């Protein structure tokens, strides 16, 4: 599979406590099949962060890759927006 055909997702980092691993929550909206109301869905993915660049609260782009561990199937591509520290 070519790199440009792999799944690419945007999400927010909710945990960076593991070494070289981040937890990213991806939020999507779907219509209810019967009532048509927009419903928010969220799913957490573990992603490989080789250089420990991403911090908690950052908006990141992750890409599908080969299995890197028992739970990791994505890798960090870029940090789109850094978190604002208050």
From Swiss-Prot:
GO biological process, alphabetically ordered: translation
GO cellular component: cytosolic small ribosomal subunit
InterPro entries according to UniProt: NA-bd_OB-fold, Ribosomal_uS17, Ribosomal_uS17_bact/chlr, Ribosomal_uS17_CS
Pfam families with a match to the protein in the record: Ribosomal_S17 (PF00366)
Coiled-coil segments on the chain, per record: none
A GO MF label: structural constituent of ribosome
Keywords tagged on the record: Ribonucleoprotein, Ribosomal protein, RNA-binding, rRNA-binding
Quaternary organization: Part of the 30S ribosomal subunit.
Function of the molecule: One of the primary rRNA binding proteins, it binds specifically to the 5'-end of 16S ribosomal RNA.
Family statement: Belongs to the universal ribosomal protein uS17 family.
Entry protein name: Small ribosomal subunit protein uS17
Species of provenance: Streptococcus pyogenes serotype M5 (strain Manfredo)
Lineage: Bacteria, Bacillati, Bacillota, Bacilli, Lactobacillales
Gene behind the chain: rpsQ
């Amino acid at each position: 599979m070519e790199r440009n055909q792999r799944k690419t997702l945007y999400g927010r980092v909710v945990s960076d406590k593991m070494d070289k691993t981040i937890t990213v929550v991806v939020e999507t909206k779907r219509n209810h099949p019967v009532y048509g109301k927009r419903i928010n869905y969220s799913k957490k993915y573990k992603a490989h962060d080789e250089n420990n660049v991403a911090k908690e609260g950052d908006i990141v782009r992750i890409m599908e890759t080969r299995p890197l561990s028992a739970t990791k199937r994505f890798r960090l591509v870029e940090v789109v927006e850094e978190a604002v520290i208050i």
